[in-house]
């Protein structure tokens, strides 16, 4: 069966491909190969810049040509790497052989004299193990995917929420705690709660460190040191990882990354996802309470049986995708830091799944935005609930009575309002008029309504 949108096993690459497609530049097999080539080339260039004695004569003007191997890398190039891997049965070794092929191709094309690269080719992947390539490529891909795709989408969501918060800043709304009426609030402020929370957690995510393992077969630069003991390979590795890749080298590792900082990143993304789940559920409830209507698109169907249905499907889609994302992120954060002795292979297949939770997250964010942009404020419904729930001003009345040293104000209001009888404006006002307080205080109390008792 040919792979396409209809035959893909994962909905990320099938039904939702258009929403997740930007992540293919960072987490596809093609992308991983390109990142590996990038790390290998930049490492070779850094060895030339050192320079190692055998690389001192390498023409530095050829560096742009070397970088073009990954900068112009195509899917066809990735297929060639896979063809090599079918023989080597080793993905990183296939990358090394591919780069050497490209060097030969430069010679064949006349870009350099025939045989020019022969003295230098064995310094491709010099002294490295596969994880020096993987544990730099993967964090680099995550860093750039977050910067180019995830951060902008969360910023867009925050911006939309802030816009609504401003638009609805003066819209009074009955609050609900434990599902029951509580002191009134303002719709704009409740929306701003989510914008604030997302901003806080986005800043925490951005503060996470993107670290990489780069230190040879067991993290000690054994091969580098035995070949060139006169060089400070720790300093070299720190500089290479920082300056060429924009990452931070982990100073003590086994064969693989410690993955502790990746765990922090996954946990930070999960917190953002969780806030959006909370947002999705709240707006789902507001729609159910008729505080919002939804824009209707001609031709769309809400139910195969009930013609009238206009369902909050975007918020539901988002919530479902975020649940999947969080489950995988939690697993990644718990599994990756654990590896037997100096390394087992369990991290290898797990790392290939990092794009999956991020895919579900970006699908979810777009669904939430779509849902938010369908909303039509139903002011009448908000006003109806306020008008029908005068008991919520009891807090205001008892607090002012406390200020006035009135005896047992809380108990008096409790006796009045904590019943199964509906509390009306008239009942509240009749109660106020019986109070033994000054006319000024009575006027102050009579001015309180569910509409204006919304705090600051």
Task: Indicate residue ranges for each PLM-predicted region.
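Catalytic-core signal marking the mid-to-C-terminal active-site face
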Residues: 2-29, 65, 71, 301-456
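A helix-coil-helix interface module used to build multimeric assemblies
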Residues: 2-221, 228, 232-240, 302, ...
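Generic, well-ordered alpha-helical scaffold segments in large soluble proteins
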Residues: 42-47, 98, 102, 145, ...
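Short amphipathic alpha-helical segments with heptad-repeat character
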Residues: 143-151, 155-158, 162, 192-195, ...
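Alpha-helical coiled-coil oligomerization motifs
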Residues: 166-169, 210, 284, 291, ...
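Glycine-rich anion/phosphate-binding loop at the beta-strand->alpha-helix junction
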Residues: 201, 248-250, 254-340
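Short conserved catalytic/interaction loops centered on acidic-Pro-aromatic/His motifs
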Residues: 205-214, 283-293, 423-424
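Active-site-adjacent "gating/activation" loops or surface patches in catalytic cores
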Residues: 231-255, 259
């Amino acid at each position: 069966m040919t792979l396409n949108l209809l035959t893909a096993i994962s909905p990320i690459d099938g039904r939702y491909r258009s929403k997740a497609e930007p992540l293919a530049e960072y987490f596809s097999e093609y992308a991983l190969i390109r990142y590996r080539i990038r790390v290998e080339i930049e490492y070779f260039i850094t060895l030339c810049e050192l320079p190692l004695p055998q690389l001192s004569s390498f023409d530095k003007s050829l560096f742009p040509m070397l970088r073009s191997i990954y900068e112009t890398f195509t899917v066809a190039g990735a297929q060639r790497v896979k063809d090599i891997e079918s023989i080597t049965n080793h993905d990183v070794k296939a990358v090394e052989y591919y780069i050497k092929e490209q060097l030969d191709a430069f010679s064949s094309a006349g870009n350099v004299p025939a045989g020019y690269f022969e003295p230098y080719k064995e310094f491709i992947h010099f002294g490295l193990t596969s994880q020096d390539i993987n544990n730099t490529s993967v964090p680099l891909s995550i860093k750039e995917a977050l910067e180019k795709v995830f951060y902008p989408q969360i910023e867009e969501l925050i911006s939309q929420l802030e816009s609504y918060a401003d638009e609805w800043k003066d819209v009074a709304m009955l609050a609900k705690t434990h599902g029951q009426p509580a002191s009134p609030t303002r719709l704009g402020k409740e929306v701003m709660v989510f914008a604030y929370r997302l901003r806080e957690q986005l800043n925490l995510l951005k503060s996470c460190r993107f670290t990489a393992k780069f230190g040879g077969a067991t993290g000690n630069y054994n091969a580098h040191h035995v070949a060139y003991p006169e060089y400070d390979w720790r300093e070299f590795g720190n500089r290479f990882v920082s300056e060429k890749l924009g990452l931070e080298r982990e100073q003590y590792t086994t064969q693989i990354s410690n993955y502790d900082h990746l765990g922090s990143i996954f946990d930070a993304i999960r917190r953002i996802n969780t806030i959006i789940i909370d947002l999705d559920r709240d707006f789902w409830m507001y729609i159910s309470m008729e505080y919002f209507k939804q824009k209707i698109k001609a031709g769309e169907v809400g139910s195969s049986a009930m013609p009238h249905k206009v369902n909050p499907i975007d918020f539901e889609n988002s919530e479902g995708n975020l649940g999947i994302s969080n489950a995988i992120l939690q697993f990644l954060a718990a599994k990756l830091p654990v590896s037997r002795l100096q390394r087992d292979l369990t991290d290898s297949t797990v790392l290939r799944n990092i794009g999956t939770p991020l895919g579900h997250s970006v699908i979810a964010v777009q669904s939430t935005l779509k849902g938010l942009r369908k909303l039509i404020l139903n002011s009448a419904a908000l006003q109806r609930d306020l008008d029908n729930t005068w008991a919520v001003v009891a807090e205001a009345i008892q607090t002012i009575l406390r200020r006035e040293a009135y005896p047992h104000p809380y108990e008096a209001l409790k006796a009045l309002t904590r019943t199964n009888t509906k509390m009306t404006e008239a009942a509240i006002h009749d109660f106020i008029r019986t109070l033994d307080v000054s006319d000024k205080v009575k006027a102050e109390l009579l001015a309180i309504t569910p509409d204006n008792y919304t705090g600051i």
